[in-house]
Amino acid sequence: IKQYTGDILLVGINYDKKTKKHQCLIESYEKKEKEIGGTMTEEQRRKIKNYDYLNQIALKGKTLFTGSSLMEMFPICEIARSRGIEEIVYNRGVGGLNTDEFLEYIHILLLDLEPSKIFINIGTNDITEERVGNQWFDHLMDNYRKILEIIYEKLDKPEVYVMAFYPANLHLPWQTAESIEWMKLRTPENIERCNKELKKIAESFGCNYLNCNIDLIDKNGEQKTEYAIDGVHMYANGYLKVFDSLVQYL
């Protein structure tokens, strides 16, 4: 049993046959965070903790957008409201998360809300050789399967939309050598390879694959300059295009 309650984490219950009593195994939230999120920043932990508190008052069965920074920076709630969408929408994106970290915190970032509709965009931070070398692709896709398995195991017939990875741009005039090194694997070829496999995985689970990239891509298959912040992340004008592609599913 895992249940986050404020600053205390209930990690298990043992039954003592001699005393015929149950014993709760309790650890501090901060201690458990260090064990399962050792590479995470203090800011990421703080965001997740805040989401945990918000989940306690959130309404169940609503629409959820979840993932990493590309989801966190999506002003979906404001855009939806401005466009006359009255459905309650929650955003549980956390910048910098990879799929391993998402799996560790999947209860807070997804399951605890018991959403009826899920839009998920996670994994761009796995497109790197820093963690698992040239096995990054297989590792990413294996984790995506695990995420979907958990969703369908724990939730009652949710409507799931696996969102395609957005295009990146490695040729912006204001990029530094450091930023290009950080995102060097996010080429049009690798993004397309990932999206093709994501589509197969989504279809194998019977969920929806949603590609919102048609208005984001330039003639070279890269992110259009007018939307680009750093070549990965986008300004709100880019997200307005994304919203136009997915609004029919809200």
Residue ranges and their predicted role:
Residues 83-88, 174-184, 221-229:
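Short glycine/proline- and charge-enriched loop/turn segments
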Residues 102, 226-250:
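Histidine-centered active-site loop/cap adjacent to the catalytic His
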Residues 10-13:
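Flexible glycine-rich surface loops and low-complexity tracts that mediate binding to linear polymers
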Residues 170-212, 237:
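Substrate-gating cap/lid alpha-helix
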Residues 121, 163-164:
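Alpha/beta-hydrolase-fold catalytic nucleophile elbow
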Residues 155-159:
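A short helix->loop->beta-strand "cap" motif at the edges of active sites that frequently abuts
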Residues 127-130, 169-175, 217-223:
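Short acidic/His/Gly/Ser-rich catalytic and metal-binding motifs that mark active-site loops
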Residues 36-145:
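Conserved SGNH/GDSL esterase-like catalytic core that processes O-acyl groups on lipids
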